[in-house]
Regions:
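Catalytic cores of TIM-barrel enzymes
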Residues: 1-167
Length: 167
């Protein structure tokens, strides 16, 4: 059962009220006694907003508080980029995928190919010290703090459900 339908909590609680969401999940689990319990996949809406997530829409963020979570099908791997991806997937993810998926990471698209940079990091320092990279670093730091706080508040929901007898 959907905690929002059963308990009346807004779906946005999964992103902005981790304690309330955890209580609602526990209430549904105890009421329905499933063979296996799912604590859901709540995440910090504040962190998602800070990062500028482009491929997901969540209640209380880009969507009204009572809407369902949605995926926005954006083309992250363009037809002419398969060779880049297959040659060096890590480079592709950092320089192409992340900047498309997170607006805050757009500056990463300006990085040179990373595959041959075994000892060349010092050459990147001028680029990495620009205001746009500093802004990206601040967004990462803020999102990290939001995520840590969210996780602290939600705790280990799976372990708590297991203690109630729901693996």
């Amino acid at each position: 059962a959907d905690p929002a339908n059963y308990t009346g909590i807004q779906r946005s609680a999964a992103y902005y009220d981790p304690i309330g969401w955890k209580r609602a999940v526990r209430e549904v689990t105890v009421a329905f006694e499933p063979d296996m319990a799912n604590a859901g996949l709540p995440m910090s809406g504040a962190a998602l907003s800070t990062l500028g997530v482009t491929n997901r829409l969540w209640p209380g963020g880009p969507l009204p508080a009572d809407y369902e979570y949605q995926v926005d099908e954006i083309e992250f791997l363009h037809e002419d980029e398969y060779d880049l991806f297959l040659t060096d997937p890590t480079d592709f993810v950092i320089r192409y995928y992340w900047p498309r998926m997170f607006t805050s990471l757009a500056p990463l698209a300006k990085l040179p190919p990373l595959g041959g940079m075994f000892q060349g990091f010092e050459g990147l320092t001028a680029m990495l010290s620009t205001p746009e990279f500093a802004q990206a670093a601040r967004a990462i730091e803020k999102a990290g703090k939001e995520t840590r706080e969210f996780r602290k508040n939600i705790g280990d929901s799976y372990a708590e459900l297991a203690e109630l007898g729901f693996p």
